[in-house]
Amino acid sequence: VEVKDNREKEPEPIVPAWEQKKKSKVKSFDLHPDIPMAERHNFDLANNQVEEVNKKERFHRNYAAIKVLKDCQNENRFATPDEQKILSRYVGWGGIPEAFDERAGAWHTEYAMLKNILTPEEYASARESTLTAFYTPPEVSTAIYKVLEQMGFQEGNLLEPSCGIGNFIGMLPKSMENAKVYGVELDTVSAGI
């Protein structure tokens, strides 16, 4: 015996457009979907500040970070927590044009090291960045986030249009942890880090 429900179904309520949940037009992707979440580690930039050092030391920190990046890419894996510390010390090439000048005698070794580790495209991009690369100091990031907090921002979309290695994004306060953060970076080495 089959019994039919002849009751009419309640119509769905009409919801104004501004109250409707919108589906994002931007699709997220996972660069390494095969790596389990348990093997992923978020690096805490706020508690791992990078101190100022001279040009040669900045070069060697950058070089070490590129080496870690290349290892991770070649092995199709994320950086370990120890490797993340090395990556966090990458500051780009702004202010170190000597490393790209084959005539700078004191920088001959570093010049050769860069030519050896970077692809021609990466090298050209890094060389171009010597005049334009700038990494936002933590104090500036913190001040901007404080203003956003005072304005009541807790969740929504945040765009970092020139994110470098993610220093600004890495300073995101707990109060905004539900925000969707989008980062764009032209330099492939910085973006990879």
Which residue ranges define each predicted feature?
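Acidic, proline-/serine-/threonine-rich low-complexity intrinsically disordered repeat tracts
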Residues: 2-16
